[in-house]
Design a protein with these regions (language model features):
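Conserved Nudix-box catalytic region and its N-terminal flanking loop in Nudix hydrolases
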Residues: 2, 51-93
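Short metal-coordination and nucleic-acid-contact micro-motifs, chiefly zinc-binding Cys/His arrays
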Residues: 5-11, 26, 43
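Short cysteine-rich clusters marking metal-coordination/redox-active sites
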Residues: 12-15, 30-33
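Short functional micro-motifs and their immediate structural scaffolds
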Residues: 20-21, 38
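Short linker/helix segments within small regulatory modules
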Residues: 21-27
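Conserved N-terminal beta-strand and adjoining loop/helix that marks the start
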Residues: 32-56, 76
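Active-site-adjacent beta-strand/loop module that shapes the phosphate/pyrophosphate-binding cleft
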Residues: 108-137
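NUDIX/MutT-family hydrolases
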Residues: 138-169
């Protein structure tokens, strides 16, 4: 069973007081020092990488959650990164592909809850599309256990493990097939 981080955090991160009460659904407030902690969603990215043969690059998840299911290359945006920079970094980390940030196109976003270390991490998943040559060399690394190119008409939504990825793949296929 997972919990929202605001249910787990019991002490003020500024002064250490136990007088750290729920302020509203998104925050806790410390009665001792006046600090208010807001739990905002984390930015996350995922890529629809298409080659010139019209195939989608799909990863097999190498780690929990949903280890062994299909996924899109992507991950969390780091501090001080733009969404595009985070997307380019994640693509390189998981596939070895080097993509020009100017060549990725934003598609849409989906709010999500990502369960990790027993907590519900609220995310805003940003989806991008980019195109590569059909002979682009890919190597599975980081969170990706395996990579495969799949023709769009052979992509099955139910094989993707994460809810927001399934929703995004369904939406992308509806717009592009």
């Amino acid at each position: 069973m997972s919990e929202h981080p605001l249910q787990v955090f019991r002490f003020c991160p500024k002064c250490g007081s136990q007088d750290f009460e729920i302020h509203n659904a998104l925050s806790r407030h410390c009665a001792q020092c006046g600090f208010t902690f807001y739990q905002n969603p984390r930015a996350s990215t995922a890529a629809f990488i298409l080659n010139t043969k019209g195939e989608l690059l799909v990863a097999t998840r190498g780690k929990e959650p949903e280890k062994g299911t299909l996924d899109l290359p992507g991950g969390f945006v780091d501090n001080e990164e733009t969404a595009e920079e985070g997307m380019v970094r994640e693509i390189k980390e998981e596939t070895g592909l080097v993509i020009d940030p100017e060549k990725i196109e934003y598609q849409f976003s989906i709010p999500n809850v990502y369960r990790y270390s027993g907590m519900d991490i609220h995310t805003l998943d940003l989806f991008f599309v980019c195109h590569v040559d059909e002979d682009a060399k890919v190597t599975a690394a980081d969170d990706a256990a395996n990579l495969q190119w799949i023709p769009l008409n052979e992509v099955y939504v139910e094989r993707f493990g994460l809810r927001s990825i399934r929703q995004a793949v369904h939406r992308f296929l509806a717009q592009n097939c």
